[in-house]
Amino acid sequence: PVQFNHATAGRCLALRVSGPEPISLELVSAASQPESLLPLRLLLLLEEQAELELSQVLLGSGSSLTSLVLEAHLGRGARLRHAVIALGEAPACLLGHLAVEQESESRYQLSTASRGWALARLEPRISQLSGAAHTQLTGLQLAEERQVAVTHSWVRFEGPDGSLEQLHKAIADGQGRSVFNGAVRVPRAAQRTNASQLSRNLLLSPQARIDTKPELEIVADDVRCAHGATVSRLQLDQLFYLQSRGIDAELAANLLKRGFCAEALQQLPAAAANWRPLERLLRQGSPLGELP
């Protein structure tokens, strides 16, 4: 995705953020023309103690391709709250690469939500350069029909006292396929690292497929690291309970799916509520390409 974006993006949006005053920014990009290409490249530099809340909304339809590359450097004590809401309609495709470097005491919070693309691939790449930084990654992807949703994340700790919280959720239905690979690297220099990684998945169709691989590589000997993965269907006892209260089967299933998704979407910035992400992800609101 990176080389492709660099070869096609004629422009780059560069932002330098300084000062302790929080800044909020929303960027909306739409690719709708048949066989169109939308290359997006964004460069962020957050100086010491700077704070930015960035929401990116990506809309795609027709046989379009959206290519996103974001590169960010967080100075000491800087904070970046970053959301990517990707709403597509097949056969549109999305390729996204998010590369973030963190200095000590910085905080990076990434929340991603995607559905509807024929192919959606997101690649968060996080490097904690000097330790004592915090990273929080929350992802939600939905794949149905013949759609493929892929997330490959990579986090590396270069110094001591770093921390990571990662939760990735996926729903696969129809003949959709969801792929998650989360790599965490803890070299010897990264003592006292505290990292947790969890992949939770719902498989709603016999023809759907889920591949999940949380991955820890630990060399340091003084760490607290854990990972796990679950793949399940909707729980029959929960469905039975709702139906016993007079709720029909379809509505009961939708309620359980809403609850599954809501946990991940709670991490989105407050401004994201204008896009009604839960309703759009579950196709219960306005058309995906319609602006709020």
Label the model's feature ranges:
Residues P1-I247, C261, L265, P269-P292:
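Conserved beta-strand/loop scaffold segments within soluble protein domains that form the structured core
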